[in-house]
């Protein structure tokens, strides 16, 4: 299947398209990346070279793909960190044009804004644009618990309230919601959870918590869930496969004490998930 991935790019390390493209290829997809920034490395280092790519240039790349007849062959559009606020208009326009060419195409949006520990780390213009313009045209969204609360205005602190927030997100437009980095009162201190939901139900998976955050893990998670989901539209199966691969990736990176995700070293766990974590239906 063909996936158009509109995200940031770094030359050194793995975030954005530099984290999403190879895992998607390893699970069998053709990936057409369009970059929204071109940096030497991710901004977590505090210093970097490069620049945001102007929205007009991003649009020109997408227009060129349309001229090649690519739109009707795109099965999914994936977007992540958007760089400048005007990129939202480009993405929304591209989604509409691609769906006109191929009504079966799905749009997966990773609404990158921040997290519970760091708060919001994007421009103040980005969150309302995601909430009001981008998320409503998405079929799949992959927020963390913090981002879900912002998008919906519904506190998500336990199972019931998180499901209510997911329902509120679905009312905004997306049919399928993956919530990452979930913490509930009953979640053990040494565990972390994800919840996936669509019109067929909601499922939870719990994995060991490794207190080791590396930039790009959310990008890999969004990419793998999207890549697995679009094959069979099976949220539980996509959740199980994604959780397995991402845990093995984080564990491998942690064991090596690597500053960057060890995606190449983890490629077998990505291509062939061990499915070591049970998925529980909760709704």
Swiss-Prot record:
UniProt keywords (A-Z) are: ATP-binding, Kinase, Magnesium, Nucleotide-binding, Transferase
EC number(s) for this protein? 2.7.1.35
Give an example GO molecular function.
magnesium ion binding
Q: Which GO terms describe its biological process?
A: pyridoxal 5'-phosphate salvage
General function of this protein: Pyridoxal kinase involved in the salvage pathway of pyridoxal 5'-phosphate (PLP). Catalyzes the phosphorylation of pyridoxal to PLP.
- Specify the domain of life of the species encoding this protein: Bacteria
Q: Which family does it belong to?
A: Belongs to the pyridoxine kinase family. PdxY subfamily.
Q: Which InterPro entries match?
A: PM/HMP-P_kinase-1, PyrdxlKinase, Pyridoxal_kinase_PdxY, Ribokinase-like
Q: Which reaction does it catalyse?
A: pyridoxal + ATP = pyridoxal 5'-phosphate + ADP + H(+)
Q: Where does ATP bind?
A: 110, 147
Kindly provide the name given to this protein in its UniProt entry: Pyridoxal kinase PdxY
Q: Is the keyword Kinase assigned to this protein?
A: yes
What EC class does the entry list?
transferase
> What cofactors does this protein use?
Mg(2+)
The opening ranks of the lineage are: Bacteria, Bacillati, Actinomycetota, Actinomycetes, Mycobacteriales
The answer to whether the entry has keyword Magnesium is yes
Q: Which HAMAP family match?
A: PdxY (MF_01639)
CDD domains from the UniProt entry:
pyridoxal_pyridoxamine_kinase (cd01173)
**Binding residue positions for substrate:** 8, 219
Q: In which pathway does it act?
A: Cofactor metabolism; pyridoxal 5'-phosphate salvage; pyridoxal 5'-phosphate from pyridoxal: step 1/1
